[in-house]
A protein has these predicted regions:
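Glycine-centered tight-turn motifs at strand-turn-strand junctions
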Residues: 71, 591-607, 620-623
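Short, glycine-anchored, charge-dense loop/turn motifs used at functional sites
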Residues: 584-592, 612
């Protein structure tokens, strides 16, 4: 069946009446599309004719208004076509060799391995990103102004003849070279995640945005780019960066390089700065009063003056060597992360808009949060806090107070709380009756004897190891997918009742069971462990672990200590010689990174605050141990 479209048919007819020229005298454009969609399957194609033009379509049933279905896997478009949008149509081939009027082609998200557009000299806009392209020919397209070819497999790209190009997106390919010296009109160049060692933009004076992050660039000359507003050059091999000729710069992302100093005195328009994971020993921000975001974590800073940054909303200066930090004049702060320093005090009373506060791994003995009524996330683990008053923080959703000196924790006012980590303290009682939204509870290594969870029916993870629990009350464990009660004083009857109350176990891989205890109920080392009835829980798909102690020796050794050790002070993860690889997971099972184990240890300073799990593997790929780490 042939689908026919006419635009302004009456106008075309009148024009033909007034001239002897007929449409048949002009060459007919032909575009062929090959799809793997089955005959009868819906396909989303939008085709627009030129002004006064018409086209026919073979291989499709239907029309643009009601939608098309495939009648043949080779689709042929003939006529005066100005634009084709064939996004996610399972195309494996596009033939443009007989096409000369097309201005716009959108073939994103298909299965193309090659694309030759060189015959379409009228083309102005081409989006072929998110395919499997190993070759792309755009030679001699003098009118092409925008090219989007990112997320492909290109090893080379020639754009020297595309002199009208203003925007080039070629990120996430395998390019080792890129010549843009002939593209003087280029405004936007996005080439991150390639294999570039050099990027020369000296002839691109009109450049406003440059993203060349995650390459292998060692030097970057920006002296000819005075109009530059946004620069992303993170994760390269830069040891120096000169931005003194870029007065319009508003965003600078230069994280994960080898920078030892950075002069920002000529960048008064700067609003966003990210220079984390470098080797900076100082950072002068006196000439950057417009900064709203400052990320300078994991450097060697001993001092940081942010007193002149009244617009600052986000500050992350974690993992430096700061002994003091004054944020009293930063009233607009909504996020403050200063974990992993040597702070003995921090005053956040003027910061009434704070939503996220991370002061973990410092030397704080007290923390006043009375004025921070907007606080939703609080991380203050590994300090020297003996108490923490959260009565004013009624919107708190996440709380991590692990590894302090707390003997009590009052949470009656925190009715929004969903995640609580309070392990490794000396807490004797814990009232959770008001925390009805609680989903995750980590309260290991405390001194709890009883715990009432009657109102906590949304719990998904419940870890209460190494307490003195004799009694636990609950109403419903219907959402639970991880239970750990190791090393308490629980009877066989109580353990049996808790196991019987478990729902169907969640589907979990062996890795998820081992590292995150998904679908695992561990009741080891309790007085009632040996006699607990595990039948129903096992029938519900739970992996029940019920190891028992034999006096001083235990049949359940600490597997982690034989392979992994975490140094909290230096944020270093050390592995024994048997470990070849370490995988880091978030607590919800997301793989964050894989690391080759070494004798010097692995730095975790750039790992986000919170709880993660390190899993050790041998050279043969065998899993050796897992270690839960609080950052």
């Amino acid at each position: 069946m042939r689908a026919v479209s006419h635009r302004r048919l009456l106008l075309s007819f009148l024009l033909l009446l007034g001239t002897e020229v007929v449409m048949g005298q002009s060459p007919t454009d032909i575009i062929r599309l090959q799809t793997t969609k089955a005959v009868g399957e819906e396909i989303n194609i939008e085709i627009a004719a030129t002004e006064g033009g018409a086209f026919t379509v073979e291989g499709l049933n239907g029309n643009e208004d009601d939608g098309y279905t495939v009648s043949a896997q080779t689709i042929v478009v003939k006529g005066d076509v100005e634009s084709i949008i064939c996004y996610k149509c399972d195309l494996v081939q596009i033939d443009l060799s007989a096409c000369h009027r097309l201005r716009k082609l959108d073939c994103r998200g298909n299965k193309l391995t090659t694309l030759d557009a060189s015959a379409v000299d009228s083309l102005q806009w081409l989006a072929c990103n998110d395919n499997e392209l190993t070759a792309l020919n755009v030679d001699n397209l003098k009118r092409l102004s925008e090219l989007y070819c990112h997320n492909n497999k290109l090893t080379s790209l020639q754009v020297s003849t595309n002199e009208a190009l203003t925007q080039l997106y070629c990120a996430t390919n395998a390019l080792s070279t890129l010549d843009v010296s002939k593209n003087a009109q280029l405004h936007v160049l996005i080439c991150h995640q390639n294999q570039l060692q050099v990027i020369d933009v000296s002839n691109n004076a009109a450049l406003i945005q440059l993203s060349c992050a995650e390459n292998q660039i060692t030097k970057l000359d920006l002296s000819h780019n005075a109009a530059l507003k946004t620069l992303g050059c993170g994760v390269n091999k830069l040891t120096s960066l000169d931005v003194s000729r870029n007065p319009a710069l508003e965003t600078l992302l230069a994280y994960e390089n080898g920078l030892t100093n950075l002069d920002l005195s000529k960048n008064p328009a700067l609003q966003r700065l990210s220079v984390g994971n470098n080797s900076l020993t100082a950072l002068d921000l006196h000439q950057n009063p417009l900064l709203t975001q400052l990320k300078c974590k994991q450097n060697n800073l001993t001092d940081l003056d942010v007193s002149g940054l009244e617009k600052l909303a986000v500050l992350d200066c974690s993992d430096n060597q700061l002994t003091r930090l004054n944020v009293e004049r930063n009233a607009a702060l909504s996020t403050l992360r200063c974990a992993g320093n040597q702070l003995e005090s921090v005053n956040v009373q003027p910061n009434v808009w704070l939503v996220t506060l991370d002061v973990s791994h410092n030397k704080l003995a007290e923390l006043d949060l009375a004025t921070n009524t907007m606080l939703a996330e609080l991380y203050c683990a590994d300090n020297q806090l003996t108490s923490v008053n959260l009565e004013s923080n009624t919107g708190l959703r996440t709380l991590d107070v692990e590894k302090n000196k707390l003997d009590s924790l009052k949470l009656e006012a925190n009715t929004m709380l969903a995640g609580l980590a309070c392990g490794h303290n000396a807490i004797k009682t814990l009232n959770l009756s008001a925390n009805v939204r609680l989903k995750e509870l980590y309260c290991v290594d405390n001194k709890l004897e009883t715990l009432d969870l009657t109102n906590n029916t949304k719990l998904k993870m419940l870890h209460l190891d190494s307490n003195q629990l004799r009694e636990i009350s609950w109403a419903n464990f219907g959402k639970l997918y991880s239970l750990s009660l190791v090393g308490n004083q629980l009877s066989a009857d109580l353990l049996s009742q808790m196991l019987d109350a478990l729902p169907k176990a969640p589907e979990a891989t062996e890795e998820e069971q081992t590292s995150f205890k998904w679908g695992v109920a561990d009741i080891s080392e309790n007085p009632g462990t040996a006699n607990a009835n595990t039948t129903k829980a096992s029938e519900n798909g739970w992996k029940v672990v019920a190891k028992v102690s034999t006096g001083i020796q235990t049949l359940r050794p600490n597997e982690a200590e034989a392979y992994l050790r975490y140094d909290q002070v230096g944020a270093m993860l050390h592995a024994t010689a048997a470990v070849a690889k370490i995988a880091l997971y978030s607590i919800d099972g997301r793989l964050m990174r894989q690391i080759e184990a070494g004798q010097e240890g692995v730095s975790l300073r750039d790992v986000p605050a919170g709880i993660c799990v390190a899993v050790a593997y041998s050279r043969s790929g065998k899993r050796l141990a897992s270690l839960r780490i609080a950052r």
